[in-house]
Amino acid sequence: MAARAVFLALSAQLLQARLMKEESPVVSWRLEPEDGTALCFIF
């Protein structure tokens, strides 16, 4: 359950990453709407 809480917390940063994705192409993210908590960050 703790991991799920972390994913939910990262969802807020995910929105910011989407706005800065054009400025930071090195940061790629993927969100799976099926679960809503599956986030994959690649730095």
UniProtKB/Swiss-Prot annotation:
One of its GO terms (cellular component) is extracellular region. Its main location: secreted. Not expressed in normal tissues, except in testis. Expressed with significant proportion in melanomas, but also in tumors of various histological origins, such as bladder carcinomas, head and neck squamous cell carcinomas, lung and breast carcinomas. Not expressed in renal, colorectal and prostatic carcinomas, leukemias and lymphomas. More frequently expressed in metastatic melanomas than in primary melanomas. Pfam families: BAGE. Keywords: Secreted, Signal. Residues 1-17 form the signal peptide. InterPro entries: BAGE-like. It comes from the Eukaryota. It is found in: Secreted. Belongs to the BAGE family. The ancestral BAGE gene was generated by juxtacentromeric reshuffling of the KMT2C/MLL3 gene. The BAGE family was expanded by juxtacentromeric movement and/or acrocentric exchanges. BAGE family is composed of expressed genes that map to the juxtacentromeric regions of chromosomes 13 and 21 and of unexpressed gene fragments that scattered in the juxtacentromeric regions of several chromosomes, including chromosomes 9, 13, 18 and 21. Unknown. Antigen recognized on a melanoma by autologous cytolytic T-lymphocytes. This is B melanoma antigen 1. It comes from Homo sapiens (Human).
